[in-house]
Each structure stands twice: as structure tokens, then as C-alpha cells.
């Protein structure tokens, strides 16, 4: 049971999450997560997509009230579209609420004009995210008045479910799409860790309506998944697994990382392996002169490794006290989480 209880520590864990917004808008983003165990790209990508499209909280218009109009199968004097078309257009209005309680907005317009979402009087607690969205066409000398109720919710709620709210006569319930995420797509590519090239890289494309940024939406979806899965953890970690003393070593735990986990060329990796350079600590203790005396190791390989070490503020010829430790294999595994 002890070995099984440590199973999750043997899997590679993602150590890089990159967010890239599209230049034309902050509502679209590309999210790259790597490296992942083979198969985990599809597992996480599908789970995140389903949560993003179904479980995030947002705001939407849930009902409207137009004077002298009692149902959606009516027509409004002076309005080109019938009530059903107007409702369909209203469903496309994207709103952001700064409070949890429902709010009633008002719309007043005089023709001739194209009535747009930006003409709605929202107050301080509600914001229209797509003010140019068209609601209807109003004829000359005609007036249109309307009350619109918006609420906070999640997912897609049919208008039939709104009848539970005991709407007054004349107030028409409409289908409400609360989710602030408009679209999510993902793909999985290969990525390299050391000499292994078939780990997964998860690439997600997320677009929101502006109520929440894509980065925040992804974070919220991950938190929802975390909370839902927490119940399945039916055991406790051993105390020694929880408390790893990172101050017990006279050198940085990262030096216990194996050099084959660095993204080296095959030639450089083989040279290090043939010279019995296994850990980063072994590598940084060597001088440049030592490395150039290694068989088949040239200036090109030297510069390649120097660039990689520089990314971690490391260099050749470093003084590493008490290196190598006697139980280096045990320490390398024990401090794995410290340098991941």
C-alpha cells in the first residue's frame, strides 16, 4: 500500500502554463499546459472544456415586459419584428452584473431608429457587454417601452423553468444562457522532456463574452474540478510525505535533477552519459575545460549546455559543497517535488 500511496509522485507534472491573448481582444486566449503524461492531454482537455461550457456563473436576461403585450405570439405596433423575433434578439444581449440580486432594466426608444442594446438603461449594477447588438427596427413616430429582468445563474435555463418564479401577467420568460464562456476548443501535441518526446502538450483556445477573462475562467473551471474530485481522496498521506525538509541540504535541491530531463540534443546527452554525468550537480561542478576534454564533446555542445544552465542561474565551475551526497538516488527521488 505504501508504494501505491505514492503513485501520483511518480507521474510527471506540468510545470509550465502559458497564456497568450489575441491582439484584437482580451476575450480570446490561447492556453498551453505542458508537460503531461501521455493521454492526460485528452483527459484534462475534455474535462476542462465541459466545465467551462456548463458550470461557470454569469448573468443573463431572464424575462421582459412590454406594455399591452401578454405573450410572445403578438406583434408590437411600429416594430418590424414580431415579439418572438425580438425575444430571440434579446437572448443575444450579453450582460455583466456586479451584484447577486436580480435587477430590472428599462428601455425607451422613439422611431425611426434601430433599437440597440446600448440604449437600455442599466443603472450602476449592470453592464451591457455588446451595446451594438440589434434588438429591433422601430418605425417613425413610434415608441417602444420595455422592462428587462436580469439575474445571476449558471448554464442554460429554459424559459419554462422560469414559471416557478410566479411571473406576473404580461411578463414573458425567455431562455437564458448564463455561461460567460462562448467557445472552448483544444488540441493535444507531443512535447519533449529530456530524451522522451511523446509526452502531451495541451493547447486550449477559450473565448468569453467579457464578463470574465479567459485566464480567470480556466482557473475557476480547474477549481470546480478540484472541489468535485476532493471527495474521492479516501486516504491520508504519510507524515513524511507531507513534510519535506528543503533546508536539510547544503546545496539547492534542483541540483538533484537528472540531466536527461534537460532538453539537450542527442549528441550532448550521449556525451554526458558516457562521461557518467547523471545529475545537474555533476554537471555544474565541471569546468568548461573539463567538458571540452570529454570525448566527442565540442564547442557547439558546450554553448548549448551553457544556455540551458543560464536559464536556471547556473554555470560551469560552481562550488557545490558535499557533492555528491552518499544517498544521492534516494535524495533525488525525495526532493523531486522541490525542483518540479
Curated annotation (Swiss-Prot):
The family this protein is said to belong to: Belongs to the RNA polymerase alpha chain family.
HAMAP family in alphabetical order: RNApol_bact_RpoA (MF_00059)
Q: Which SUPFAM superfamilies match?
A: C-terminal domain of RNA polymerase alpha subunit (SSF47789), Insert subdomain of RNA polymerase alpha subunit (SSF56553), RBP11-like subunits of RNA polymerase (SSF55257)
Question: What is the organism field in this record?
Answer: Rickettsia peacockii (strain Rustic)
Q: Which Pfam families match?
A: RNA_pol_A_bac, RNA_pol_A_CTD, RNA_pol_L
Return the domain comment text from this UniProt entry: The N-terminal domain is essential for RNAP assembly and basal transcription, whereas the C-terminal domain is involved in interaction with transcriptional regulators and with upstream promoter elements.
Subunit structure as annotated in this protein's UniProt entry = Homodimer. The RNAP catalytic core consists of 2 alpha, 1 beta, 1 beta' and 1 omega subunit. When a sigma factor is associated with the core the holoenzyme is formed, which can initiate transcription.
* GO biological processes: DNA-templated transcription
Known EC number: 2.7.7.6
Q: Give a short account of what the protein does.
A: DNA-dependent RNA polymerase catalyzes the transcription of DNA into RNA using the four ribonucleoside triphosphates as substrates.
Q: Name one GO cellular component term.
A: cytoplasm
Q: Does the keyword Lipid metabolism apply?
A: no
Q: Where is this region: Alpha C-terminal domain (alpha-CTD)?
A: 251-340
Q: What are the alphabetically sorted keywords of the record? A: DNA-directed RNA polymerase, Nucleotidyltransferase, Transcription, Transferase
Q: Out of the domains of life, which is the source?
A: Bacteria
Q: Name one GO molecular function term.
A: protein dimerization activity
What reaction does this catalyse?
A: RNA(n) + a ribonucleoside 5'-triphosphate = RNA(n+1) + diphosphate
Q: What is this protein called?
A: DNA-directed RNA polymerase subunit alpha
Amino acid at each position: 500500500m505504501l508504494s501505491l500511496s505514492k503513485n501520483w509522485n511518480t507521474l510527471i507534472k506540468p510545470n509550465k502554463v502559458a497564456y497568450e491573448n489575441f491582439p484584437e481582444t482580451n476575450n480570446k486566449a490561447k492556453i498551453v499546459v505542458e508537460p503531461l503524461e501521455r493521454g492526460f492531454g485528452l483527459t484534462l482537455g475534455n474535462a476542462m472544456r465541459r466545465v467551462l461550457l456548463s458550470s461557470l456563473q454569469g448573468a443573463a436576461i431572464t424575462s421582459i415586459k412590454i406594455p399591452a403585450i401578454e405573450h410572445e405570439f403578438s406583434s408590437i405596433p411600429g416594430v418590424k419584428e414580431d415579439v418572438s423575433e425580438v425575444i430571440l434578439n434579446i437572448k443575444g444581449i450579453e450582460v455583466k452584473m456586479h451584484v447577486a440580486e436580480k435587477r430590472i432594466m428599462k428601455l425607451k426608444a422613439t422611431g425611426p431608429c434601430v433599437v440597440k442594446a446600448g440604449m437600455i438603461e442599466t443603472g450602476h449594477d449592470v453592464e451591457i457587454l455588446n451595446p451594438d447588438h440589434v434588438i429591433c427596427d422601430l418605425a417613425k413616430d413610434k415608441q417602444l417601452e420595455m422592462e428587462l429582468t436580469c439575474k445571476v445563474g449558471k448554464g442554460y435555463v429554459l424559459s419554462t423553468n422560469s414559471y416557478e418564479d410566479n411571473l406576473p401577467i404580461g411578463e414573458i420568460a425567455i431562455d437564458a444562457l448564463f455561461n460567460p464562456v462562448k467557445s472552448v476548443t483544444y488540441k493535444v501535441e507531443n512535447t519533449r522532456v529530456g530524451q522522451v518526446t511523446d509526452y502531451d502538450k495541451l493547447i486550449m483556445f477559450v473565448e468569453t463574452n467579457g464578463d470574465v477573462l479567459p485566464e480567470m475562467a480556466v482557473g475557476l473551471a480547474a477549481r470546480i474540478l478540484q472541489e468535485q474530485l476532493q471527495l474521492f481522496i479516501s486516504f491520508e498521506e504519510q507524515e513524511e510525505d507531507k513534510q519535506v525538509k528543503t533546508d536539510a541540504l547544503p546545496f539547492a535541491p534542483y541540483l538533484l535533477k537528472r540531466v536527461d530531463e534537460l532538453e539537450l540534443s542527442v549528441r550532448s546527452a550521449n556525451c554526458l552519459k558516457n562521461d557518467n554525468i547523471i545529475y545537474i550537480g555533476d554537471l555544474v561542478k565541471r569546468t568548461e575545460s573539463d567538458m571540452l576534454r570529454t570525448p566527442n564533446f565540442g564547442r557547439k555542445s558546450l554553448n548549448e549546455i551553457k544556455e540551458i544552465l543560464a536559464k536556471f542561474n547556473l554555470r560551469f565551475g560552481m562550488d557545490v559543497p558535499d557533492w555528491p551526497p552518499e544517498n544521492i538516488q534516494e535524495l533525488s527521488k525525495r526532493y523531486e517535488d522541490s525542483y518540479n
